[in-house]
Amino acid sequence: MAGIFKEFFFSTEDLPEVILTLSLISSIGAFLNRHLEDFPIPVPVILFLLGCSFEVLSFTSSQVQRYANAIQWMSPDLFFRIFTPVVFFTTAFDMDTYMLQKLFWQILLISIPGFLVNYILVLWHLASVNQLLLKPTQWLLFSAILVSSDPMLTAAAIRDLGLSRSLISLINGESLMTSVISLITFTSIMDFDQRLQSKRNHTLAEEIVGGICSYIIASFLFGILSSKLIQFWMSTVFGDDVNHISLIFSILYLIFYICELVGMSGIFTLAIVGLLLNSTSFKAAIEETLLLEFWTFLSRIAFLMVFTFFGLLIPAHTYLYIEFVDIYYSLNIYLTLIVLRFLTLLLISPVLSRVGHEFSWRWIFIMVCSEMKGMPNINMALLLAYSDLYFGSDKEKSQILFHGVLVCLITLVVNRFILPVAVTILGLRDATSTKYKSVCCTFQHFQELTKSAASALKFDKDLANADWNMIEKAITLENPYMLNEEETTEHQKVKCPHCNKEIDEIFNTEAMELANRRLLSAQIASYQRQYRNEILSQSAVQVLVGAAESFGEKKGKCMSLDTIKNYSESQKTVTFARKLLLNWVYNTRKEKEGPSKYFFFRICHTIVFTEEFEHVGYLVILMNIFPFIISWISQLNVIYHSELKHTNYCFLTLYILEALLKIAAMRKDFFSHAWNIFELAITLIGILHVILIEIDTIKYIFNETEVIVFIKVVQFFRILRIFKLIAPKLLQIIDKRMSHQKTFWYGILKGYVQGEADIMTIIDQITSSKQIKQMLLKQVIRNMEHAIKELGYLEYDHPEIAVTVKTKEEINVMLNMATEILKAFGLKGIISKTEGAGINKLIMAKKKEVLDSQSIIRPLTVEEVLYHIPWLDKNKDYINFIQEKAKVVTFDCGNDIFEEGDEPKGIYIIISGMVKLEKSKPGLGIDQMVESKEKDFPIIDTDYMLSGEIIGEINCLTNEPMKYSATCKTVVETCFIPKTHLYDAFEQCSPLIKQKMWLKLGLAITARKIREHLSYEDWNYNMQLKLSNIYVVDIPMSTKTDIYDENLIYVILIHGAVEDCLLRKTYRAPFLIPITCHQIQSIEDFTKVVIIQTPINMKTFRRNIRKFVPKHKSYLTPGLIGSVGTLEEGIQEERNVKEDGAHSAATARSPQPCSLLGTKFNCKESPRINLRKVRKE
């Protein structure tokens, strides 16, 4: 620190002036960014002119000079090392990594061959004109300054122009790589010239090779290693977000300075680190947001300081050399750079259009006009001007500095006007009329939701005297995407290219592509949300997001499970290595032909295919290692030269004998094994080596050193035979690694299924077209069914993986909920910060323990399955009674457990395997009339049940025929509980079993409906609190029931059907009853609803419900009012129920996963509502 202050400041007395100057620059820069964002002159130019004005004014006032000197004593090299790392890392970090992968070859062609051609052309032009009368080294440095670009300003210039995602990524990637290569070229030339001046003996070839190895290859590898270490640290370390930020900030600067000290390119290394890191490298949403905001803040501060300091650091005497011809020369350089860059891109455009994602000739104009020059150019010019080495006179350095800075300013001003005009003329804005109409409708929907929320607040008595006219006026926003009349009426109808029929414009290809893009965006958001909630691992979310991003620009294509599988396999080398070992190295014992009929060949066959022969071969290989090691030690090689020579002959004889025996035993089949050919080739090379050694004329043909090198190489190839020994062990290691890949793939499948389920809840908001909506929904349902089927097969083949993943996932969910509860206690003041921090450390320790755990959890047995059924409540008496007549039933693949319309025989608990549930007659059983009118969704008639799930519960409770068929897709093992025995359990054990079964079904259906209809509500602590206060209530058929109470949250119909007494509208289960429904009446004999209420006044609520339950309805099954209590409380209330003739309470359990057909209800969305208490009118 003392050295930095000594270099940064002239003296410690300058510290107040420096702090005041930095604060002033930050304030002025923030003001300019806010108020002059659309000003014709760019903000960087204004900041630079302010710095220049401050430098000029320093000669008129001693007070101003005092502040200017405090900044000017900073070394340009230190200035470069402070601000440049922040800018380059932030720019690389903010890029679209997945699009850069698709455009990799295009960026590589433009950045390396294109840069070289452009650099040579600029150098040729400058040397030909020779206006500045410079030397060759100065021309080389000046050309590097002019060719470079500013990636931060370039990205900012094209961000809001509406360009396509591919073009933006191409421009950003090319600008970043061009600036990095320019800096490497500039630094290499200066280093080479410095060595020439110090009279060191280095050739140009050595400098070029050394520069490529150190600045490019070594920096690239070190960047990859650093990014992997940072990602590993971020995924395993649990701690404070502020500590994460400070440590990452320190690590990045540490990486930069380590690279600079050892001779690598710190800028290139940080660019690689920024590109390899992305949003999925962070553990939580808060941490990600803090880091992004922190780096954005640093980059903006660096932006303000850099351009203001540029004006201050340019010496005032530079302006003394300025003439009008210099300004003209700078304009000439600017126009020449544009022409040469255009010619370069035009020259390589045929190759770019073939190797990349897409490329258009219009892109060339935008790439030329979008190139902004700024910080790297001026920084290199300052480094040259302030260099202590001799690169020219002060006048020559001042000319290079002036022209470099002036060209940058001209580029910033002129390109700001040209670029938007060029985009509009060339028609490259990615903003079509369909997209604008879609965004306009989205904005209108947003306004409607805002106004409806305001309308609901009008009934609040505390806001009765508020000025609602002013409130409504304040929340009414002007639609920025409002279309004019021409845009609204144009292209209302288009003709189908196949049938020449007019169809709705909203159903054209453009609208379909827009819907597909939004679908992919929603999928990515779902995967990232699952990662933040620690449901998905970091590697799994990277694969899912990468696969979705890879389809972002593919027109007419949608992501499916096959594309994810191909994408994940393309990222892994384990599969390739295993195939290589199996096909090339590992020699199987299965010969294609049997032993020969000839005695000699049959004896050879018997000898070769024995364990002893193979082991002797391995022993010979191991023994050959010792002479090989001795031959590599020069002193021992001279002493034992004769012995090594004869030993080599002996081993070669053994190899020849082995090859002859194998050829005699296997005959032509010998040449069908790759390993045999490899061994034979090594043996032939050994024979050739002996021949060359024994012939004396070899000394006259080859150099003796070359002969020695050849011998060593041959001996090394011979030792490679030892690889055959470790090949089986390597296969075992790879197989173990691939078993981990199964767990990884299982996590991907679960994340993909959840993502598709999330998409189904927001399908209405993706598009307003009914046809497109139906197509998207069919596609999502098809993909989800395929994924569930794949998940079932994987779970059947590897049940231990499924149990382990589900267990660890649920542990993470529960620990996250514990964190949410702890935060809620802290906000309410129940617990102090110190106490909360101590408890949080315990939670983090548990999370780390789960993360580090490598144990495999075995699947549940038949006896253990019963202990995990919620409605048995781990009661030994209940379980023992059920086990009396419960039996294990196994079904073969393809067998039907039951068919649609069959009478229920009992409950099937799946122990292992996968069952497909399907409705052959979608209209049978449950009437979907109401929902089909309100929604344009097709009814889902297929589902898959996996291990641990239960089939037939609701049919046994209602004694209704099965409304779906169950077919085994694998061998299925189930625990079957007969229906009669289940009824006996209700009567002999306790009616609570039946009530808890209804409660379990109600929780499952309620959880699913809330997730479907209220997807914007996080599945967190608050939602779990709501589900812990649920009640299952019977709705009578002959009595109207009011729905109104301030303590109610939701009312969900889980079985049967009800009618809205006011609107005469029918709702069939499962359905979320809307707020517009104030009074309902059952229209079926058996109807149940789930009530979710706030935690207050629960006892009063239960009593109120008991009071209004009709006693004369004999056909009503005794209902359930669930509460959060113990089993003893439930038994006590059961006695009260018997006395009062009412219903009893039971313990509420956590909701189990409910499949779409497990409850056999297929109902969709209804408006979001606040629901109330059930009472009898």
UniProtKB/Swiss-Prot annotation:
InterPro entries: Cation/H_exchanger_CPA1, Cation/H_exchanger_TM, cNMP-bd_dom, cNMP-bd_dom_sf, Ion_trans_dom, RmlC-like_jellyroll, Volt_channel_dom_sf. Residues 38-42, 94-103, 162-164, 237-240, 280-286, 355-360, 427-612, 665-671, 732-1177 are cytoplasmic. One of its GO terms (molecular function) is sodium:proton antiporter activity. The keyword Ribosomal protein does not apply. Keywords: Antiport, Cell membrane, Cell projection, Cilium, Developmental protein, Differentiation, Flagellum, Ion transport, Membrane, Sodium, Sodium transport, Spermatogenesis, Transmembrane, Transmembrane helix, Transport. PROSITE patterns: CNMP_BINDING_3. This is Solute carrier family 9 member C1.
